[in-house]
Swiss-Prot record:
Known function: Member of a network of 50S ribosomal subunit biogenesis factors which assembles along the 30S-50S interface, preventing incorrect 23S rRNA structures from forming. Promotes peptidyl transferase center (PTC) maturation.
UniProt subcellular location: Cytoplasm
Gene Ontology BP term (one): assembly of large subunit precursor of preribosome
UniProt superkingdom: Bacteria
InterPro entries documented for this protein: DarP (IPR006839), DarP_sf (IPR023153)
Pfam families linked to this entry: DarP (PF04751)
Statement: the UniProt record of this protein carries the keyword Glycoprotein: no
Amino-acid biosynthesis listed as a keyword: no
NCBIfam families xref list: PRK05255.1-1
One function term, GO molecular function aspect: ribosome binding
Name of this chain's protein: Dual-action ribosomal maturation protein DarP
Gene3D superfamilies from the UniProt entry: PSPTO4464-like domains (1.10.60.30)
Length: 196
């Protein structure tokens, strides 16, 4: 029953303004879902019955028709449980945070690559201080090859390879992952031999 509670004087239901704000939040969430790539969308806990509506909204490009289809998508989304929509929002927030960390890591890898090419062994020593698991000889060879390629105006194969090596080196730390299983096993073996 709508209206006020006779004893407490509080409203029984949400106000129209609150309902409108909730509907606009769902519409904004729908816009985010439509803007995602299929791979990003597959990682989210989106109910199966919403996927065709999202695909249809992506397909329509005419402004007014797109807006109307987006409103239709939001209407279907409002029928979902609040917990489902909250799970989608949480997953979107986690994806955006992971994406920001990956971009920051890539910038760091590019900076290290430029520093390695400019400073040589001095920068390599600093890199090994930060990342002791790095292969010194491999990086030194790649830096030397990249400098030679640049001097001879050859395609920058080693230059790209330095970035790939740095990326694989920095990615676990950027994403907050533990060391690789091989490193953990090596540490466990070393600990077991210390105990004997």
């Amino acid at each position: 029953m709508r209206g006020r509670d006779e004893e407490t004087g509080e409203f029984h239901d949400k106000s129209r303004s609150q309902n409108r704000r909730d509907a606009l939040d769902v519409l904004a969430l729908g816009e985010k879902l439509v803007s995602l790539t299929p791979a990003q969308l597959a990682r989210l806990p989106v109910p199966e019955d919403l996927l065709p509506h999202i695909a249809e909204c992506k397909r329509i490009t005419a402004h007014i028709a797109h807006k109307r289809q987006l409103a239709f998508l939001a209407k279907h989304m409002r029928r979902e449980e609040d917990a489902t929509l909250d799970a989608i929002r949480d997953a979107l927030d986690a994806n955006s945070e992971t994406g920001r960390r990956e971009v920051a890591m890539m910038h760091r890898a590019e900076d290290w690559r430029e520093r390695l090419l400019a400073e040589g062994d001095k920068a390599l020593a600093a890199l090994l201080d930060d990342y002791p698991q790095a292969d010194r000889q491999q990086l030194r060879t790649l830096v030397r090859n990249a400098q030679a390629e640049k001097a001879k105006n050859k395609p920058p194969r080693a230059y790209r390879e330095i970035f790939q090596v740095l990326r694989t080196l920095m990615l676990p730390a950027a994403l907050g992952l533990k060391a690789s299983d091989d490193e953990v096993e090596a540490d466990d073996t070393a600990d077991a031999s210390d105990e004997d």
